[in-house]
């Protein structure tokens, strides 16, 4: 019976397939094809940019303690008040401001220092071998002397130049002791630095966008982990050009009982308690250090729902007025209930270590636990402009890599375990995490260990020596995508990082670090190779000494003496080999004629008598062998 059922099922499947091939479709075929064509998430296997397989920061957020954060009770109150339709609301018109990467260009030198030690060992043959140990060491301020005057000249040394200064050499050889000689070798990379100034009262800064560095230019020196940067300030005027420019105009809303200004068109909300006006080269700009600085234009009253309802009732009969009022109250109650309930939900679900930004009724925010252990929320701006720098590098702290703003050219640091970056955070700003990452990666490369980088999607990229074939490990986390982000940003496929793109970028990053660490490392040799080299080179060394001795003894007849001696040695060796071969052949013939005792006892008496001459011949054979051995 079961076989019959299986045949029926197979027949049904085949029949359905044939109907599809013949063009027969059900009533929902067109709807299925339409959904597949319009929904980009169905294209994940081929186009991984839409959805859970994007590897880049989704948001840029304010720092935890810069005044932009709202305490959880304040945020909850502002969220609930924004839901009320009877409060006074105003429209705030602003113009966005963008601070571009513009400044005075100066040359900057990044120096990577390696201590290279050679140890010599001379064996009994007189053969000298060299063993090398190379390790990264901190670059000192005195190492600036390795930068020559021609390197500072941009005409002779363009930006992007690489110099290898090698001071290490093989150690001298000594027959009675091993000698170790250590020296410092330098790799010097020429970068472009720019002197920039954000506002009139802000200090002058030096930005090295290639390395994600922003620092005080007056020191002319910066050390981070075991790498250092050197530069010289120009003697002339250091007033940088203006980097501010105006962008799009926005209309934002403000409720008089709240702490927030909400700009729905960009998905960002300002905390009015934390924004301030600063004078710049382009005029007065608000929130100059925030994700979206702006020029204030004007504001006007926003018509309330009650005013809109009153306007709609003008000239209407009583029946229509009652209907309008009823519909208005229903929508107000529905919106208030939904909005307030969502505010309550977000206020109760926060955790201090939240690594993901949340979409709320009043914009996108992230949870933080401030120094006073008071939970708060920080505003965040959805963005698709921040992408991984090419080439990239490891910044401070574990899983921090260099990113760049494609709109302005500024660089920053991204903790890949989070779906956001923080304004103003670059590769040398987080002192708590310094020394745990790039230095650790270099040490891991020296030890031949595996390097792992974890992303906020839960996925991990694992790179094992020789670091040219990364492996992806699929993660399992609750938040792997944020659908609301796609509706808040302008996005195209050229702006996204897929898994293949990340693989290429990080592989190049690790290989560049490997080249810095192991640029002069000797190839390892097995014991077999070492012994072979010592024997061959040792014999050659002994031969050379013998040749020198004979040259001193016989003068111009040295070659003739060496030829005669070589012929004599060859004659002796061939004579010995011939006699050994003769002995071996005698042994083999004797072995073939050997008679076993058990065979002799089983033979008839006449066979025993016939075998006696054979035994006597064996005796003579042994005597002959002994004579040959004596001759040898």
UniProtKB/Swiss-Prot annotation:
Positions of glycan attachment: 93, 385, 501, 512, 541
Signal peptide span: 1-17
Transmembrane domains' residue ranges: 560-578
Protein topology in the membrane: Single-pass type I membrane protein
A cellular component term, taken from the record's GO annotations: virion membrane
Subcellular location(s) of the protein: Virion membrane
Predominant place of localization: virion
GO biological processes: symbiont entry into host cell; virion attachment to host cell
Domain of life, source organism: Viruses
Record's keyword terms, sorted: Glycoprotein, Host-virus interaction, Membrane, Signal, Transmembrane, Transmembrane helix, Viral attachment to host cell, Viral envelope protein, Virion, Virus entry into host cell
Function: This protein forms spikes on the surface of the virion. It is responsible both for the binding of the virus to susceptible host cells and for inducing the uptake of the virus by the cell. The interaction between the internal components of the virion and the portion of the glycoprotein exposed on the cytoplasmic face of the plasma membrane probably directs envelopment and virus budding.
Family: Belongs to the nucleorhabdovirus glycoprotein family.
Protein's recorded name: Spike glycoprotein
Taxonomic lineage of the native organism: Viruses, Riboviria, Orthornavirae, Negarnaviricota, Haploviricotina
Gene giving rise to this polypeptide: G
């Amino acid at each position: 019976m079961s076989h019959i059922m299986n045949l029926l099922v197979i027949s049904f499947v085949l029949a359905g397939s044939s109907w599809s091939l013949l063009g027969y479709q059900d009533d929902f075929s067109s709807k299925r094809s339409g959904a597949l064509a319009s929904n980009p998430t169905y294209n994940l296997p081929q186009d991984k940019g839409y959805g859970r397989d994007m590897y880049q920061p989704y948001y840029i957020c304010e720092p935890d303690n810069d005044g932009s954060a709202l305490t959880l009770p304040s945020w909850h109150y502002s969220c609930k008040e924004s839901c009320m339709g009877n409060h006074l609301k105003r429209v705030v018109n602003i113009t966005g401001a963008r601070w571009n990467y513009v400044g005075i260009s100066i040359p900057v030198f990044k120096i990577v220092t390696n201590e290279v030690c050679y140890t010599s060992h001379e064996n009994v043959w007189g053969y000298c071998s060299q063993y090398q140990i190379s390790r990264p060491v901190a670059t000192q301020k005195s190492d600036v002397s390795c930068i020559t005057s021609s390197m500072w000249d941009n005409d002779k040394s363009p930006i992007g130049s690489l110099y290898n200064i090698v001071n290490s050499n093989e150690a001298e050889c000594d027959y009675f002791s091993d000698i170790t000689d250590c020296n410092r070798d330098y790799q010097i990379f020429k970068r472009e630095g720019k002197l920039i100034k954000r506002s009139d009262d802000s200090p002058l800064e030096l930005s090295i966008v290639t390395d994600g560095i922003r620092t005080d230019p007056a020191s002319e020196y910066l050390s981070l982990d075991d790498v250092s940067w050197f530069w010289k300030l120009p003697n002339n005027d250091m007033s940088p050009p203006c980097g501010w420019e105006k962008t799009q105009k926005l209309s934002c809303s403000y409720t008089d009982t709240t702490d927030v200004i909400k700009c729905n068109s960009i998905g960002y909300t300002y905390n009015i308690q934390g924004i301030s006006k600063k004078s710049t080269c382009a005029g007065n700009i608000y929130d100059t250090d925030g994700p979206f600085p702006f020029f204030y234009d004007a504001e006007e009253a926003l018509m309330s729902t009650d005013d809109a309802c009153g306007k709609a009732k003008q000239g209407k009969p009583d029946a229509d007025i009652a209907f309008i009022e009823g519909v208005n109250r229903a929508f107000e109650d529905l919106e208030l209930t939904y909005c307030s309930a969502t505010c309550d939900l977000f206020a109760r679900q926060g955790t201090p270590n939240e690594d993901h930004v949340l979409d709320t009724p009043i914009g996108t925010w992230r949870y933080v636990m401030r120094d006073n252990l008071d939970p708060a929320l920080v505003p965040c701006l959805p963005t698709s402009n921040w992408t991984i720098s090419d080439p990239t590098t490891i910044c401070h702290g574990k899983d921090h890599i260099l990113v760049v703003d494609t709109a302005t050219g500024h660089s920053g640091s991204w903790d890949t375990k989070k779906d956001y970056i923080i304004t103003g955070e670059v590769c040398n700003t987080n002192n708590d995490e310094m020394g745990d990452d790039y230095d650790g990666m270099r040490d891991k490369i020296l030890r031949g260990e595996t390097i792992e980088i974890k992303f906020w999607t839960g996925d991990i990229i694992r790179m094992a020596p020789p670091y040219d074939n990364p492996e992806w490990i699929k993660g399992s986390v609750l938040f792997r995508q944020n659908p609301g982000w796609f509706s808040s940003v302008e996005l195209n496929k050229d702006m996204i990082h897929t898994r293949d793109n990340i693989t290429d970028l990080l592989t190049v990053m690790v290989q560049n670090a490997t080249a810095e660490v192991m640029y002069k490392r000797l190839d390892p040799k097995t014991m077999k190779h070492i012994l072979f080299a010592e024997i061959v080179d040792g014999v050659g060394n002994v031969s050379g000494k013998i040749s020198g001795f004979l040259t001193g003894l016989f003068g111009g007849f040295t070659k003739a003496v060496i030829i005669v001696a070589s012929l004599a040695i060859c004659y002796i060796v061939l004579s010995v080999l011939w006699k050994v071969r003769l002995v071996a052949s005698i042994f083999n013939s004797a072995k073939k004629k050997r008679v076993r005792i058990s065979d002799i006892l089983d033979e008839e008496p006449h066979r025993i008598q016939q075998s006696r001459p054979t035994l006597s011949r064996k005796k003579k054979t042994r005597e002959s062998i002994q004579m040959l051995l004596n001759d040898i």
